[in-house]
Amino acid sequence: MKIVIIFFIAMMAVGVYSKDGYLVKKNGCKYDCTPLFGDSNCNGECKAFKASWGSCYWFACYCRGLPDSVPTYPSSKTCSS
């Protein structure tokens, strides 16, 4: 029985950092990148927001393992330059 309880607690902890998506700025626009050179930049940007890693995908930074509080695309805000 203790194992079942520990399993559920562990699953809840993992779920906190399980959000994936395109990182957006405060103005609602995605973080831009260049596919051949942008992976290291995107990885740094995503990790700054507590993601597990990030990469450049379709000319925008895609993050894995973001906290639920970090806004991702599509954002409720529209992109305004």
From Swiss-Prot:
| Coiled-coil features, chain-numbered ranges | none
Query: Which cysteines are cross-linked by disulfides?
Result: C29-C79, C33-C56, C42-C61, C46-C63
Q: Does the keyword Secreted apply?
A: yes
The record's tissue-specificity note reads: Expressed by the venom gland.
Q: Which UniProt keywords apply?
A: Disulfide bond, Ion channel impairing toxin, Neurotoxin, Secreted, Signal, Toxin, Voltage-gated sodium channel impairing toxin
Q: Which GO terms describe its molecular function?
A: sodium channel inhibitor activity; toxin activity
Domain named LCN-type CS-alpha/beta: residues = 19-80
GO BP terms in the entry: defense response
For this UniProt entry, which residues form the secretion signal?
A: 1-18
Q: Know anything about its domains from the record?
A: Has the structural arrangement of an alpha-helix connected to antiparallel beta-sheets by disulfide bonds (CS-alpha/beta).
* Protein name, as recorded: Neurotoxin LmNaTx11.1
What organism, scientifically named, is this protein from? Lychas mucronatus (Chinese swimming scorpion)
